[in-house]
Amino acid sequence: MKKIALLLLAVVFSFLFVFAENAAPAQKPAEKRALQWSKNPATKIIWKEAEWYCKNIKEDGYTDWRLPTIDELRTLVENCPESATGGTCGISETNNKLTINDYNKETCRGCKKGRMKLKGKGWFWSSSQRTDTDHYWVISFNNARISEAKMIMAYNVYCVR
C-alpha cells in the first residue's frame, strides 16, 4: 500500500513539475538579458504620461515595460562616441552622475552624423531624474544630443523591458 501511495505521489509531482515548466515562459533577470524596446514610440507626451504609458503598455505578450534610463537610451547611439555608452558626456545613472555639475554642453552636444538604432525624430524621455531638480534627462534622436527637460515638456518615448 505504501509503495502504491509513493508511486502515486511521484506521478502527481512529476505532472505538476512538467505543468509548471510549460505554464509560463521563463524570463531571465533584466541584467542578464538583452534590452527589448517597444516597437513604436509614443509621441509628444509629458513625463508623467510617458511613465504611465510604459507601465501600462502590453506588447508581444509582455506587461513588464518601463521608461528607459538615460544609460539605456545611450546604448542606441550610433556615430557619436561622445553620447554613446561610455562616451565623454558625463550624464549616467549607472555612475550616479545626474546633476547639472555632471553635464558638459560640449561633450553632450551630440554629433552631426549621430543617429539612433531605433526610428524616430525629436527628443525622447528617460526615467533618469536630474538629482538637483525635478527635470529629467532626455536624448535627441536627431543628433544624439543629451540634455535636460522640465516634466511639462511634451516629448516622445520608447519603452524598454
Predicted regions mapped to residue ranges:
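An exposed tryptophan-centered "aromatic clamp" motif
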Residues: E51-Y62, I70-Y136
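Positively charged n-region of N-terminal signal peptides that target proteins for export
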Residues: M1-I4
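Bacterial N-terminal signal peptides
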Residues: L7-L16
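Active-site-proximal beta-strand/loop segments in catalytic clefts of secreted hydrolases
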Residues: K39-A42, P68-L76, S126-R130, S140-N143, ...
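Extracellular adhesion/carbohydrate-recognition regions
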Residues: A20-W65, N156-V160
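Short, structured beta-strand segments at or near domain termini in extracellular proteins/domains
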Residues: W123-W125, E148-R161
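Acidic/polar residues at beta-strand termini and the immediately following turn/coil
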Residues: K28-A30, V138-N142
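Short, P/G- and charge-enriched loop/turn segments at secondary-structure junctions
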Residues: G110-K113, N143-E148
